[in-house]
Structures are given as structure tokens and as C-alpha cells.
Amino acid sequence: MDIHFKKLLLPILALFAMTAHAQSLSGLVTDEETGQPLEAVMISVLRNGTMIDYALTDARGRYSLPWKYNGSLQVSVSLLGYRREIRNISAAETLHIRLHSEAIALKEVQIRPGRIHGRKDTVRYNLAEFASSKDVHIKDVLKKLPGVDIDDNGQVKYKGKAIDHYFVEGMDVTGGRYSQINNNLSAKAVKSAEIMENYQSVKALKGKLSSDEIALNLKLDPQARDQWIINGTLGAGWSDGTQETTGTAQTKRDKGTLLWENAANALQLGKGKQSIYGYKSNNNGTDLSREQHILTNNTSQQIPLHGFLVQPGISAPLDKQRLLFNETHTLNANRMYKWNDERSLRLQAGYTHNRITQQRGNSQVYYQPDDTIRMDETYHYCLQNDATHMEIHYEDNKAIHYLSNRFLAESETNRGTSHELQQTMRTSQFTAKNFFSLIRNGEKYTWEFNSATQYAYLPSSLSLHDRKDKFIQHSLYNDNKASHLRKHNGFTRQYTAGIKGEWASVKHHSTRMETFGASSFSPYLSPYFQLEQGKWQGSLSLPLSYKRYFSQQRSFLFFNPSLYLRYQPDYHWKIFLYGSLHRSAGDVTDLCPFTYRTDYRTWKNTDGLFPVSTRQQYNLYGEYKNTVQEFFATATLSYRHVHYNTLNEQSISENRIVHSLRLHSNSTQILFLLSTLSKGFFDWNLKTSLDLQLSRNTGWQLTRVSDTDALTPQTETAGNGPPQKYRYDYLKMEPKLIWSPAEAFEAEYHATISYGGSKIGNDTHLAPLLDFVQRMHLTFSIGHVDLCLSGEHYRNDLNSDTHLNTLFVDASLIYKTRKWRVEASLSNLFNKKEYAYTTYSATQSYTSRLNIRPREVMVTAGYQF
């Protein structure tokens, strides 16, 4: 049977035809006197005295180097404290070396240890070589590491990809909410950071199923390990009055506001048990809610939920702390136990209360085939949010047995109000989830069972001056699957069979009661094959599923294959190719058979249609890393083509927007290039990086031009104008620099350059928008005092004739001792109070004007117990 499977699989994985093992130079390095193996010995291949390749010995003293050279070369074997050995070699062979210990006489010699060490799939950073006295928390050090970046939301990325696991001493105490560590753990408490690629978190699957996951592990200083680290912060300040514009263009001035900032947290991080407790509160624009967000990628335990009403977002291409008028309180508790490096129990709970206000005005321009419609609105908006979560996770992670059960309960309520729009929107979500996994390893086979269950209750309402719409959603979801796996001679076969079902009920209260169901049932089978041959690896997934929608009396057969090929010639290079085909049907909001409102002037109507999409995706990825040179580079070229059986139609009038589904075959295409470059310079204490994004997005939009009522059911496109084709091109570059030439000075620079233009139909070309943001942060240190100066310059186009220049300047003075940290800060020195920006989307342009935080003064005092 194995022979038949290989004959079927190998033609598909054509690149695997090269199955011969590459020749290699390998051997063992030991101590001449003791015979003990030596770790971290540098094995260098030299040509005319120049190093062309290298490897390090592992903990057992072994090394291996792919041999792809012709002619006579030299192999140098060196380790500090031992005499260097040089051998001539002309072909791959097994070369064992015994090193003689040697005393070292140092005279006016400076030994410079490496800051980064790489071995196989692990990169280790010595944080002492990157940290400075100006770094407060561990996030301040992590962002200095070549190859590592932290985005505005606090998410840690390695070579442009978000990490999948965040450990401290091998334990995930926050369950992915690692901002609670990044924003609170002292930079001095961490000794080193490890990045582990191709990380397989389940020991029972190691060596059987490959993984593309990335894990970050922090190793603490021995003096900080298992010790309680307790911090407290108190702060107060004053905010200047804001300038507000009403709907009649009259201007008034608010009085000043008293500011506060309070925080208390306690951390105990060790190898057997860990705890993190914290409370924070402020109204100075700092977004504390991010500390409760799960930032790691864990798609296997995410069950999507879709609501009918969505609260308006408070966002702009501006640092969030400048536009967020908030009152926030957040509380979290985390406790984790670990026994025998295998069994663990994690307990978590958290709560956030957030009240956000914003005043803004919007101008939306809709470009239709025969007309252009402009809609303006100016309003005050208040959003109150309360969110809680509670989690219990038990795991028994052995090589022959794996058991995991994770229970999670979450609730979130939102109330958004605008008096000018006479609109109040309430959205809530209450969920209870349980994820169970069991794996058993036999002599030849591996058995696995997984179960996922979720109950969700989503009440929501939209209150207007003349009516109230109310939705009540219930959903019970269950997915059970079992799999059988075997690996033999580098060839893995896994067969998974499961049953997935959802009971979904929706009630809509408006002028009358309307109900509908979106329940479904789906058995599925998913064969998976993986082949490893030397430098090559490939996998083929062939999932097949049947899905039945009971209320709609519709059935679908989905076949969603995917192919993955990877070539890794050596430690430095990695190339992979990915292709997939995915067919899916609409979610519960697409299946709604009646018309409903989403805000005070917008309606949505599906006309009872059943949207089905087919997506093709192709990715080509390449990366290069050189830890000795502190250089990391990646590039991704991707193409996505999605075919739809329905097309979105928009009908725009002076006081109403209607989005309807119409039967019309169409497609969208997205082509994009992503690239990241990161380079460290040891001698200059400098890190530079560049992120590049280039994309083209094309699609179709249908616009109603007849006088018929847009809310009248109409499944054909007759009577409407022809579909408009749109194209949007976008370029974005982000150069960054962090430079610490001396203990007394540090500089940080971050620029964002974006350029985007849109074409609608054959005649409408929207002027390209150029947005240029520069951020500079300088720190000067004299003894216990730091002086920080920050500047931000925003230059952005509003239209073809108008652009806006906005300059922000901040300053702070910090006094610090071993226990105390006192800071006086002045933000927005020039007292800028308004900001505006323009964006393009499909067949419309959107210009927004909003109030921003005025000049503010804050004084905070922090103490570490």
C-alpha cells in the first residue's frame, strides 16, 4: 500500500524527484585530554583565507556542513581556550577533530562576543548587548533585535510574521496576551531571548508533522527568576481645552481636563510556577485594552462569529494616543503551574472598562457611472465598552501521550451613542467555548481526537429617533474529528474524519417580528500527505466536505486542496511555494432573507440569495538570514483570485445608502509583494529595517441608476447600470532606525511613506494620495536624568489640490534611581487640535476630520518594591 501511495504522490510533488542525499562534511569535535564533546565550536570553510561557510557543533560535539564545493579548501576548527586546527580538504568526508587546550595571554586585546547565535531553527539573542539604561520594559529591548519588530498594536513579529507562542522560561502564562509581559516586565530581569522556528508545541507530533510556527522564549536573569517583581505608578496632569465644531460650523471651546494615570502590577516568573496580576487606569490616551487582547496566531481554536450590527471604529492614520479621548480601567490575573516539564495548569481572568469619546466630520464621495454623490456628516460619538474573560487550560504534554482541555468564557457589551445622528447602537457578545485534544502514540501509528464546542448569544439593537431595530442571535457550534497518522521513511500520511454542525437562530424585531435559521450540518474527510527528502519538504492536503443548510434547503460539496513545497539548501536560505483552492458559502448575515438597517442611513438587503465564493491563492516566499552578520531578509509574492456568484449593488441617495446582493458572476484579483529587511551593526549599536508593501486590487461594483426602489427585491441586474470595474494601487514603505552610539545618547527614527491611487470605470481617475509620516525620538542621559525629545511630522494629501502638514513635538524629563522613576512630560507642545485625512475604497473616497488631544502636562512617579 505504501508503494502505491508514493507512486501517486511523487508525480504531484514533482520537485521531490531529487531524493539523493547531498554530500556533507561531518564529524565530532572533542577535548584532547578528557575526550568530552565540545559545544559551539566554530567549523569554518576557507577559500584563500576567506570564510565561505560555517557551522557550530551541537551539545554532543557533532557538526554537519553540506558540501557543494570543488577544488582544495581549508577547514578551520576554533574555540576560545583551545588551539586552532586547520585541515586541507578537497571532498566531503567524516572528519573528527581533537582540540588541545591552550592558555590565553591577553594584552591590549578586546574580545567581542557575538550578540546573536544561530543553530538549526533557533536564534539566541544576548539581551545584555542590546539593552541600555534607558530601557524600562522588555518591549524596549525586543524592538532593538535584528529580525524582530513590534507593531503599533504590541504584536511581536519575526521576519515580518507574527509569533505563534510567547514563553517565559518555557511557560505561556498569559495565553497569548503577552502585552501584559511586554509592558510590565523589567528589561533588566531578562538575560536572553530565543526565537524558535518550525516550532512543534506538541511533543507527541515532533518528528511526525512539520510546523511553520514561531515561538519566542525569554530566559530570565537568575536573580529575577522566581522572585516577586512589584511595581506601582501614580500620575496626574492637565489637558488644555479642545476646540469643537458643531453641525452649524460654530466653534466652541471646552474647559481643561484633569488627567490621571495609575498602575499596580505584580509578577513572579519561574520554571515551575508563574503569576501576573495587574490593575491599570488612565484618561491620557494610552490604550490599556490592548493588554487583554490575544496577539498570538492560534487559528485552530478560533470559531468565527458574525453579528448584524457593527460599532463604528475610532481610528485614523495617526498614533492612537493622540486621538483617543478615554477613561479606561483594566484588571487581570494569571496563574500557571507546571510539573515535570510536561503537565501544566493555567488560570486566567480579566476585565476592561473603556469609555471613549470623539468628535469628527466625514465627507464621502460616491462615483457612479452618470453621477457623483457627496454625503457629509458631523457628530459627537461616545462608545462605552465592558469586556471580561475567564480561562482554564490543562495540558499533559508527553512524547507518547498528549491531553489538553481549554475552557474559555467571554463577554463584551458596547454602547455607541451620537446625539446629532439621533442614533444609539448596542452590541453584545456572550460566549462559552471548550477545546479538547487527545493524542496517543503507538509503535507505528498515532491516533488523535479533537473536539470544539461553542455557545454564543449575541443581542444587539439600533435605536433611532423614530424606530428601534433589535436582533437576538443564538448559536451552538460543535466540531468532532478523529485522525490516524503514520510516518515511514520520511513519508507521513494522516487521515482525518469529522462531523461539524451549528444550530443558529436569529430574531429581528422592527415594525414586525421576523425570524430565520442558519443551521448547518457538515461531515468531512481530510487526507494529508507530507514528504521529507533531504533539503526538500512538501505536503498535500485534500479536504472534502459536504454541507447542508436546513432552512435554506441547500447543499454543497466543497473540495479545498492545497499544496506546499519547501526547499532549504542550508541554514541561510529558505524558499517555499504554496497554492490552494477554497470554496465556501456565505455566513449568517449573508443568509438573512429580509432587509435590515445597519445604522441611521444604511440598509442591507440580500434578497434571499445564497452567495458562494471560490478562492485561488498562490504564494512564493523566500528568506535569507545570517546571524553572524545580523542580517535578515524576506520577500513574498502573492496572487489571489476570488470568484463570486453574487455582486454587491449600492444605491446612493441624499439620505440613504442601500447595499443589496444581485445575481451576477464576477471576480476580484489581488496581487501584492511584501518584503522585510533588517540589519544590525554591532560596532555602531545600530539596527536598521525596511518594510515594503506593493499591491494592486481590482474588482467590480454595481450601482443602481434607475428610479425603482432599491429596497424592492430584484435578483437580476436588468434595470441597473453596467457593473463598474475599479482598480486600486498602493505602495507603502517603512524605514526604521534605532541607534545607541553611547550610553549618554539614543536615537530612534521611523518613517511611513504611502502612495495610492484609484481608477473607477473607464473615465474616473482619482488623484494619487501621498502620505508621509516621520517620527524622531531622541534621548540624552546625564547621570540619573534622561531628557527625551520627540517630533512627529504628518504630510498627507486630502485631494489633488490640497495637502495637510501637521507637526507634533513632545518632551519629557526623567529622574531614575534603583527603585524610583519620576517623569514630567509635555505633549503636543504646539497645541494642534484637529487632523484630517483621505482614503479610497472601491468606488468612493472618504475624507475625515477629527479632534485630537491638545497640549497636555503629566507627572508620574513609579516605584519598584
Model-derived regions, located:
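Short, ordered, surface-exposed loop/turn motifs in non-cytosolic proteins
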Residues: 33-47
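Face-selective signature of the C-terminal outer-membrane beta-barrel domain
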Residues: 332, 336-354, 382-552, 568, ...
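Conserved C-terminal beta-signal and adjacent last beta-strands/turns
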Residues: 732-753, 763-865
